[in-house]
Amino acid sequence: MSHSVKIYDTCIGCTQCVRACPTDVLEMVPWDGCKASQIASAPRTEDCVGCKRCESACPTDFLSVRVYLGSETTRSMGLAY
């Protein structure tokens, strides 16, 4: 089951989400848009288990990394209407 992982440009390049991910879905890549000159990237979304630890680890006011669970997972968790 794949989930969608979206990285927003509010990322400050702190690496907290990368370190929190238990399945190494995330990695840092060079980016000139922030002070740290790097941004999180999600090249291996097929390995995402939907735990959302990356979201919990993100220190920005607007979460810079979001995990959107696949519809099958949403239904099985009782979150769908």
UniProtKB/Swiss-Prot annotation:
Cofactor mode of binding and number, as noted: Binds 2 [4Fe-4S] clusters. Cluster 2 is most probably the spectroscopically characterized electron acceptor FA and cluster 1 is most probably FB.
Top-level taxon: Eukaryota
SUPFAM superfamilies: 4Fe-4S ferredoxins (SSF54862)
Record GO cellular component, one term: photosystem I
Cofactor dependence: [4Fe-4S] cluster
Gene Ontology biological process: photosynthetic electron transport in photosystem I
Residues that, per the record, bind [4Fe-4S] cluster 1: C11, C14, C17, C58
Enzyme Commission no: 1.97.1.12
Catalysis: reaction(s): reduced [plastocyanin] + hnu + oxidized [2Fe-2S]-[ferredoxin] = oxidized [plastocyanin] + reduced [2Fe-2S]-[ferredoxin]
Keywords carried by this UniProt record: 4Fe-4S, Chloroplast, Electron transport, Iron, Iron-sulfur, Membrane, Metal-binding, Oxidoreductase, Photosynthesis, Photosystem I, Plastid, Repeat, Thylakoid, Transport
Enzymatic class: oxidoreductase
Binding site for [4Fe-4S] cluster 2: C21, C48, C51, C54
Membrane topology: Peripheral membrane protein
Subunit organization: The eukaryotic PSI reaction center is composed of at least 11 subunits.
Protein name: Photosystem I iron-sulfur center
